[in-house]
Amino acid sequence: MTLSTSQSLLEKTALETYVPPARPSLIGLSRAELAEALGGIGVAASQRKMRAQQLWHWMYFRGVQEFAEMTSISKEMRSQLAEHFTVARPEVVAEQISNDGTRKWLLRLPSGVSGEKAHEVECVYIPETDRGTLCVSSQVGCTLNCSFCHTGTQKLVRNLTAGEIVGQVMVARDRLNDWADRETPNGNRLVTNVVMMGMGEPLYNFDAVRDALLIVSDNEGIGISRRRVTLSTSGVVPNIVRAGEEIGVMLAISLHAVRDELRDELVPLNRKYPLAELLQACRDYPGASNARRITFEYVMLKDVNDSLDDAKLLVKLLSGIPAKINLIPFNPWPGTAYKCSDWDQIEKFSEYIFNAGYSSPVRTPRGRDILAACGQLKSETEKLTAREREALRAMAMTD
C-alpha cells in the first residue's frame, strides 16, 4: 500500500511555553454557571437568565468565536463581555489528514501552572458515508497503563476541564465549517457522533466529562443526541451506574480479555475491579436494552486473546447483557510487542459470536498512517523519533 498522508503543521512549536489568558473562556459553562459569571460582572439579576440563554445560543449553536458576532446582544453588553471573558477553544497546533480521510488535531491547552510548558491532547475525526464520528480525549495522558495502548505509555499529567472537552467538539466544527447558520439552521452536520475514546479514562474525570457531555447533547446548543454519544471506560466500576444516571449516554466497555489473569496484564485496572464486578455493573446500567445495547470493545491480539475458546467464554460472560461486540484489529505502534490477529482468525472469532446471537462487527482501522487509530493516540509532547516514524511508515505499508 502506498502511504499518502497529507500533513499540515501550523507555524508553531508544540513545546513552547503557553501563557494562560488573563480572561477566562466561557466555553464549558452550563446555563446556571453562565448566569453566575454574568452576575460577577454586574449584570442585573433580572437579566441573567435571558442573557445566559443568548450566550448559550451563540456559543454552542452558532459557534461564534468573538462576542462582536453576537448581534442579538447590545453593543454595550458585548464590549463588557469581551473585557472580562473569551469564547476561546483549545489551540490547534497541528492537523494531519490520513489517506482515508481521517483527521487528527493536536490541541494545546493551558498548563494551569505559571511557567510550565503547554499541555496537549489529540482529537480525531473519522468521516464515514452515514456519519461523522469525533473521538474526544478526557485527560492529558493516562493512568491505566494498558499494555497494548500507545496512550498508556504517556504518564497522566492532568484531567481536562469541561471546557477543554467541549472545546474539542467545537474545534472540529470550526475546522470542518460545521456550524449552523441562518441558511442551514437545521441542516445536516458533519460531526454526528461523539465517542469518549481518546486519551484518558473518562470515568476518572467524572464531573468534567458529565458536565461536558450534557452540554454537547443539549438540543438547544451543539445538539448531538445522547444516543449518538458513547462513553468508553476500561471499567471504573463505581462510576458506571452513576454515568447512566447522571449522563445517560451510550456505554462502551474496553474488555479485551475474558479471563482475569490475562485482563490483569492487558488492562491493569482489572486487578482493582475484576470481570465479575465489571459485568455486574453493566447489568445494572440504567437504560440498557436491546435498543440501547452496551458495546464491548475487544482488541484482537495474535495468539493472546483470539482463540475460539476465548470467543466461547466471551459469549458465556455476556449472557443476560444487551450487548454488541466490536472486534478491533490491533493497530501497531513503534515499540509494541503485540501483533494483530490473522484476518482468518478474526473472521472465525466474529462468526462464532454472531452465530451465538450477538452483533460482532470488525472495526475498520482508520488513520493508522497518522497514529490516529484506536489505541494509537499520544500527545506530541513526547515526540516520535525519526526511527519510530520510519517504523510506523513500514507498518502502514505492510497492511
From Swiss-Prot:
The keyword Metal-binding applies. It catalyses: adenosine(2503) in 23S rRNA + 2 reduced [2Fe-2S]-[ferredoxin] + 2 S-adenosyl-L-methionine = 2-methyladenosine(2503) in 23S rRNA + 5'-deoxyadenosine + L-methionine + 2 oxidized [2Fe-2S]-[ferredoxin] + S-adenosyl-L-homocysteine; adenosine(37) in tRNA + 2 reduced [2Fe-2S]-[ferredoxin] + 2 S-adenosyl-L-methionine = 2-methyladenosine(37) in tRNA + 5'-deoxyadenosine + L-methionine + 2 oxidized [2Fe-2S]-[ferredoxin] + S-adenosyl-L-homocysteine. InterPro entries: Aldolase_TIM, Methyltransferase_A, RlmN_N, RNA_MTrfase_RlmN, rRNA_lsu_MTrfase_RlmN/Cfr, rSAM. It comes from the Bacteria. [4Fe-4S] cluster binds at C142, C146, C149. Specifically methylates position 2 of adenine 2503 in 23S rRNA and position 2 of adenine 37 in tRNAs. m2A2503 modification seems to play a crucial role in the proofreading step occurring at the peptidyl transferase center and thus would serve to optimize ribosomal fidelity. This is Dual-specificity RNA methyltransferase RlmN. It comes from Rhodopseudomonas palustris (strain BisB18).
